[in-house]
Amino acid sequence: MIEASKLKAGMTFETADGKLIRVLEASHHKPGKGNTIMRMKLRDVRTGSTFDTSYRPEEKFEQAIIETVPAQYLYKMDDTAYFMNNETYDQYEIPTVNIENELLYILENSEVKIQFYGTEVIGVQIPTTVELTVAETQPSIKGATVTGSGKPATMETGLVVNVPDFIEAGQKLVINTAEGTYVSRA
């Protein structure tokens, strides 16, 4: 059992009614009067629906045991993404609504980890940084420096990242997947 105050983004727990829930955001909130509450943005792993809720810090939940298996992202068709286990060559289908954020960071043939809850495939774990190519951005301004405010750049996967002014279309960049931010040129 884990207390609500210990839940952090990325953790998965099971509710009393059997729902498998992943924490997207968690924060302590202390109103002017009264007790502290935990405000959370959560996703139902099975349905993909997201919702906001609050818990008392002492409320307890059953932490879900999630296992991971190395896999390769094959392709996306309609509303399904296809992955292949690197060891057994088994193929897995995951509804894109459950992993739409992760799909912004991976290309076909990328190495990922498939997440299992028992025998049920529930998600994808991606690396902490990835290399993506800039598909489109505003032209560079002559004399631009690193200290500028930056500009938006659309990556080859559709992800939009704020990048320094000197970045041009076609360049490979290292992107932090946890925050969706530019790290460096590749």
Curated annotation (Swiss-Prot):
Family the entry assigns: Belongs to the elongation factor P family.
Name of the protein this chain belongs to: Elongation factor P
UniProt KW Iron keyword: no
GO BP terms, alphabetized: peptide biosynthetic process
The gene coding this protein: efp
Function according to Swiss-Prot or TrEMBL: Involved in peptide bond synthesis. Stimulates efficient translation and peptide-bond synthesis on native or reconstituted 70S ribosomes in vitro. Probably functions indirectly by altering the affinity of the ribosome for aminoacyl-tRNA, thus increasing their reactivity as acceptors for peptidyl transferase.
NCBIfam families for this protein: efp, PRK00529.1
Principal subcellular localization: cytoplasm
